[in-house]
């Protein structure tokens, strides 16, 4: 009897172990014939591996795809080709994707410290319509970035600027004598750039966006170019310039319609767009994520063409912690929704709304059951009551993909004042996230540090903002230009350190912390945009180390507290900002300020 019991127990244990094992499948990319540090094109191999995984794995299984540590090269040839409409990017299609993950569940991509290097014009990684997925332990870079890094070697007021391209920059002087960057399948002409101090990698003081005209350029020696029309006394020899264009076709990582995603120890060293763009996703965690250089000895000065991370129309909770964001050409993080402009009132329950910005359209805006509210664009005041969508369909084409206009029917009657003539926007309140931004370092970047536009709880704590060049923290809201929603109702900014922000001027940069909704007609505004309660925005226990005056600018706020903060003044730069006030407030009520 004892033998039978032992056998039964052994059988039960073996079945349990095999059941657990069956719940997790582990694949190694080397199984598919791709080895680390080989010159083999990884794009078609990874595409086939993902297809095999999808075919073999059962619903509910945990799946791990591992890459043995090393370098993997992804080319356009053999990549996945998709039509993607990506918020705040160029809507040019099709897109070529190196690692396309779609309709996945419980998938982990583990790079084990690998470098994923891309060529041409590609989206390195996409993750769409997926649940419970993890991306971890890899970096993203391009062999030939579309930004051309050059160093000023001579600056003659009469003869112009002479510069040397960085060793990795391939270039040519065109037939019409223009400096052009070259890469696999692309040619770039550069209209403007950002200047970095050659020693500190800070954005050069009081330069902002600089023009870099190279018409008439010629080589004076191998890899040494004189540009007679490029004259700028601020660019002393040794200055490094990141030459760039206006385009932003491809983020490093594109996420859409995902639920519960984690990005752990992932680094983006370059992308011709944002480092990470997530739209219409729920619950995202970034831990140890970086848009950064490859350490202190990296010869590059720049990272991404636009924001480091960007979250458009997401919900749930966005957590971004322990990250490093440096050298990017825009904000470290931007969280917002998108206003649709009312272009037609069909009846008392139906409106036609339109995506207005040329880089934000073509993707889903809302669903039946979503809560919405309406705003008057001129004064950014809410009008009427909150409402609910009962039906929504694309209006200018037959499907959501690529649509710019939507017919939306609401549960309750729409306020009679809302029409297509006076300027009104529709805001989706359901697709708004809670945000925790903590323990991050933001440094040496263009424009601003962080930007938040969400009514849900937002906590910004224990971060280092080091020479962000513009405003360190911006609370915005705009139904006139960018059309990025919305009002902030519950914001805590605490235990952060700010070192010499505002060395340059960019949009909305009125102080180190700038609460700046875009309100064309502020004088006729009766209500307030941000806040709405006592302590709606609290700024406390921070340290400001600054060379200039403006610490806090606020416009149209009800409920603002500034307390227990330390302000130190240094002489590292000459004060130049037009705002000479420590605290400049416009239409702010219910405010308490004490250093």
Swiss-Prot record:
InterPro entries: Beta-barrel_GLAA-B_II, Pectin_lyas_fold, Pectin_lyase_fold/virulence. Coiled coil: none annotated. Keywords: Glycosidase, Hydrolase, Repeat, Signal. It catalyses: Hydrolysis of terminal, non-reducing branched (1->3)-alpha-D-galactosidic residues, producing free D-galactose; Hydrolysis of terminal, non-reducing linear (1->3)-alpha-D-galactosidic residues, producing free D-galactose; Hydrolysis of terminal, non-reducing alpha-D-galactose residues in alpha-D-galactosides, including galactose oligosaccharides, galactomannans and galactolipids. Alpha-galactosidase. Removes both branched alpha-1,3-linked galactose residues of blood group B antigens and linear alpha-1,3-linked galactose structures. Residues 1-22 form the signal peptide. It comes from the Bacteria. GO terms for molecular function: alpha-galactosidase activity. It comes from Bacteroides fragilis (strain YCH46). SUPFAM superfamilies: Pectin lyase-like. PbH1 repeats lie at residues 432-454, 455-477, 488-541. Its EC number is 3.2.1.n1, 3.2.1.n2, 3.2.1.22. The lineage of its organism: Bacteria, Pseudomonadati, Bacteroidota, Bacteroidia, Bacteroidales. Belongs to the glycosyl hydrolase 110 family. B subfamily. It is an enzyme of class 3 (hydrolase). This is Alpha-1,3-galactosidase B.
């Amino acid at each position: 009897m004892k033998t039978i019991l032992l056998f039964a127990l052994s059988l039960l244990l073996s079945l349990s172990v095999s059941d657990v094992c069956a719940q997790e499948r582990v694949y190694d990319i080397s199984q598919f014939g791709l080895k680390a540090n080989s010159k083999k094109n990884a794009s078609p191999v990874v595409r086939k591996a993902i297809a095999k995984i999808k075919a073999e794995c059962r619903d509910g299984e945990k799946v791990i795809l591992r890459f043995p540590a090393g370098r993997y090269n992804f080319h356009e040839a053999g990549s996945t080709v998709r039509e993607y409409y990506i918020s705040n990017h160029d809507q040019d299609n099709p897109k070529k994707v190196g690692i396309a993950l779609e309709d996945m569940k419980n998938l982990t991509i583990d790079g084990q410290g690998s470098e994923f290097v891309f060529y041409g014009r590609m989206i390195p990684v996409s993750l769409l319509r997926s649940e419970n997925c993890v991306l971890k332990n890899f970096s993203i870079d391009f062999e030939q970035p579309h930004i051309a890094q050059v160093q000023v070697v001579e600056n003659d007021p009469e003869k112009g600027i002479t510069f040397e391209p960085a060793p990795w920059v391939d270039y040519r002087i065109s037939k019409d004598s223009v400096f052009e960057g070259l890469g696999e399948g692309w040619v770039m002409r550069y209209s403007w750039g950002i200047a970095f101090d050659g020693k500190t990698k800070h954005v050069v003081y009081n330069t902002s966006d600089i023009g870099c005209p190279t018409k008439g350029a010629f080589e004076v020696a191998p890899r040494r170019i004189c540009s007679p029309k490029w004259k700028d006394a601020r660019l002393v020899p040794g200055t490094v310039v990141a030459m760039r264009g206006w385009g932003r076709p491809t983020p490093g990582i594109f996420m859409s319609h995902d639920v519960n995603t984690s990005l752990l120890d992932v680094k983006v060293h370059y992308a011709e767009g944002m480092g990470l763009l997530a739209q219409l996703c729920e619950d995202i965690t970034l831990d140890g994520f970086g848009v950064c250089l490859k350490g202190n000895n990296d010869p590059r000065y720049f990272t991404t063409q636009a924001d480091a991370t960007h979250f458009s129309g997401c919900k749930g909770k966005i957590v971004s912690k322990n990250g490093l964001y440096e050298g990017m050409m825009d904000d470290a993080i931007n969280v917002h929704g998108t206003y649709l402009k009312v272009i037609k009132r069909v009846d008392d329950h139906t409106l036609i709304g339109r995506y207005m910005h040329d880089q934000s359209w073509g993707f889903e805006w809302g669903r039946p059951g979503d809560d919405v509210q309406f705003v008057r664009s001129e004064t950014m005041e809410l009008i009427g009551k909150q409402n609910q969508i009962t039906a929504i369909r694309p209006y200018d084409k037959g499907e959501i993909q690529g649509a710019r206009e939507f017919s939306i029917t609401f549960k309750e009657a729409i306020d009679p004042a809302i029409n297509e003539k006076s300027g009104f926007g529709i805001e989706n309140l359901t697709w708004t996230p809670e945000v925790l931004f903590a323990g991050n370092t933001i440094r040496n970047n263009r424009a601003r540090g962080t930007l938040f536009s969400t009514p849900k709880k937002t906590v910004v704590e224990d971060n280092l903002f080091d020479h962000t060049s513009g405003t360190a923290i911006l609370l915005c809201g705009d139904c006139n230009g960018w059309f990025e929603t919305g009002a902030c109702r519950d914001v805590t900014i605490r235990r952060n350190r700010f070192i010499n922000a505002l060395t340059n001027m960019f949009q909305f940069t009125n102080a180190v912390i700038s609460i700046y909704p875009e309100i064309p007609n502020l004088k006729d505004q009766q209500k307030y945009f941000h806040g709405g309660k006592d302590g709606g925005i609290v700024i406390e226990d921070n340290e400001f180390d600054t060379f200039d005056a403006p610490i806090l600018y606020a416009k149209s706020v009800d409920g603002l507290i500034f307390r227990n903060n330390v302000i130190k003044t240094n002489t590292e730069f000459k004060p130049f900002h037009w705002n000479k006030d420590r605290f400049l407030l416009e239409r702010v009520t219910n405010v308490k300020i004490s250093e």
